[in-house]
Amino acid sequence: MKQAALDAWVRKQEGLSCVTRQDLETLQLKKLNQLLKREKERGGFYGNLPFRLDSLEEVKELPFTTEEDLRREGNRMVLLSQSLIERVRTETTSGTTGTAKRIYYSEEDQNRTVSFFAAGLSELVHKGEKTMICMPFSGARGLGELISEAVCQLEATPVKAGIGSTYGELLDILEEEKPETFVGMPIPLLSLLRLKPKNSLQRALISADVCPKGIQKEIEMRLGSRLYPHYGSREMGLAGAVTCPAFQGMHLRENDILAEIVDKAGNPLPAGCWGELVITTLQAEAMPLIRYRTGDYTRFYAEPCSCGSVLHRLDQVSRMEQGQSLAELDEKLFSASGVIDYQTTLTKKGIWVEGYGTAPLEMPGISNWRGYLVEYRWRLVKKEDKPCYLGKRRIL
């Protein structure tokens, strides 16, 4: 079986002819000590950490960085002058008036992300083909722009669909451009495949939201090929882990990211055990993070990948706090083939579901979910309708 393209990328980035697990861990320790030296010299948020460590085992003795730290002390984590910052990504928490979370990136940080994207996409994007990108395009090398750069590096053509387009506009793109591949979130992809089931997309990489197993199975059936899940976040430079042709989990970008799995108390967990993902961004130039608790729930696979890669693999990733996630409800409601999309609102009575589909008489309904009374209103989908969520699917 073909080895993960990410392994070749790691070798090229690090100037190595081959990569063993020992090589990788030696590299991680070297980069970690270089980072600790930078932090000590800078004297910022991490200035009180040790100057160096003798082994990766000692990492667990370092304190965690929390989301609250990032909100309150983020400026003290930046190691470059503002003139060298190419992009700042800001995230505010809905329903709060607290400080926004800002992540800073240098030009080199962004270039490395593009390079990783190209490596991951090379598994499914072929020279001379077209790739439909349903991700945000925000200018100044935003996410959509970075993906487009990666597609161009592969000598393919990006079709910049973005987010917020109507189904009519998206179907026109499919008809006129005839892209072979898709990059975007899972539910919008499923919706498109249900609206245009024939002569449509052939391959896809999904990211930015959870893809329930039943939905993944249907997407793969409609595509006629396996899905390539990707995991990334602002804190890790958008690019974190991607699936290989063995389809046995997502290989981590371990030359740039030191990852751990811990329990709720912060104790390290072995491979195979589910817990919270903790990351140290070893290669980040502008704003490296040390032992950042992501709030994401996953595990490392214990067994080696059949593709032969030595890079750790993540299982499916979800949020630690599942209270507002729609993944479970999506699994139930999208089991009806007529559903195109829906939106939920929390009311005094329970949960109000409003959605559209291709056959309203076949729309599903469940009266109770997680103790909530669930009420519905379904209608036929129109060309003017848009996907109900531009980001992660949550109860509003």
Locate each region found by the language model.
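Conserved beta-strand termini and adjacent loop/short-helix elements that scaffold enzyme active sites
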Residues: A161-I163, H230-G232, V262, T347, ...
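AMP-binding/adenylate-forming catalytic core of the ANL superfamily
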Residues: F182, V278, L282-G371
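Residue-level signal for inorganic ion chemistry
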Residues: E39, T93, F182, G232, ...
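Conserved AMP-binding/adenylate-forming
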Residues: K217-P304
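Nucleotide 5′-phosphate-binding alpha/beta core
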Residues: M1-T92, G98-R112, A119, A265, ...
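Generic structural signal for residues in well-ordered beta-strands
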Residues: P158, L227, A259, Y342, ...
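Active-site phosphate/ATP/adenylate-binding loop shared across adenylate-forming ligases
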Residues: M1-A5, Q13-G15, E67-E218, R222, ...
